[in-house]
């Protein structure tokens, strides 16, 4: 049974790799869009299966496509922005992926290399935090705030900020504002 599970995991990793673009982006399907959240999910699946170099390629794509404000656009097609909305859940999820990558590889150098990307992503989301603590969902393509906090996105954002705090501690950095 264990061998069957290992074969299944490897076949899924092989499928993800077969979809990955040379840039590191992992679209939903061949010729489809890439969204930052799913790209990180796929990178974590690659880490889980031991395909670390392909996971690093996906994380580097995240670093290379991050907007100056720390966000990512909601979708890309062949590495070009397609949907210009900016989701706070997408901007923080890189921290979850990087924490998982570190746990599976213990590669502190890569964690340090990716830190600016993680930090900017979390700071983008926190820039939309409201006095009550909720973090608004995102910005429209015209940079207008989308008021409201969706439960699933908020849960992912909360987990990602916690992962970012763990990364900061491992890098001996202090991010007290992230605990608010």
What label would you give each PLM region?
Residues 1-2, 40-54, 93-110, 156-173:
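Well-ordered alpha-helical scaffold segments within catalytic/enzyme domains
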Residues 1-37, 48-72, 125, 132:
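Low-complexity, Ser/Thr/Pro/Gly-enriched N-terminal "stalk/linker" regions
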Residues 3-14, 53, 108-112, 116, ...:
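Generic alpha-helical secondary structure signal
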Residues 6, 32-36, 85-91, 108, ...:
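Alpha-solenoid helical-repeat scaffolds
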Residues 14, 21, 25-28, 74-75, ...:
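The feature captures the catalytic groove of carbohydrate-active enzymes
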Residues 39-40, 77:
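Active-site beta-loop-alpha junctions enriched in small/polar residues
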Residues 50-122, 126-129:
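Helix-terminus loop motifs that line ligand-binding clefts
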């Amino acid at each position: 049974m264990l061998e069957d599970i290992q074969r299944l995991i490897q076949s899924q990793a092989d499928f993800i790799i077969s979809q990955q673009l040379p840039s590191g982006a992992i679209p939903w399907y061949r010729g489809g869009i890439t969204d930052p959240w799913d790209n990180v999910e796929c990178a974590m699946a690659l880490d889980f299966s031991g395909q670390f170099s392909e996971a690093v390629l996906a994380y580097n794509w995240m670093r290379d496509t991050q907007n100056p404000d720390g966000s990512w656009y909601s979708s890309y097609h062949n590495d070009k922005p397609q949907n210009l909305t900016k989701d706070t859940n997408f901007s923080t999820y890189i921290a979850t992926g990087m924490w998982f990558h570190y746990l599976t590889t213990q590669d502190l150098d890569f964690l340090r290399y990716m830190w600016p990307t993680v930090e900017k992503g979390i700071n983008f989301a926190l820039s939309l935090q409201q006095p009550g603590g909720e973090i608004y969902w995102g910005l429209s393509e015209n940079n207008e705030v989308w008021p409201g906090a969706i439960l699933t996105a908020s849960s992912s954002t909360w987990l990602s900020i916690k992962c970012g705090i763990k990364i900061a501690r491992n890098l001996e950095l202090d991010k007290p504002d992230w605990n608010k």
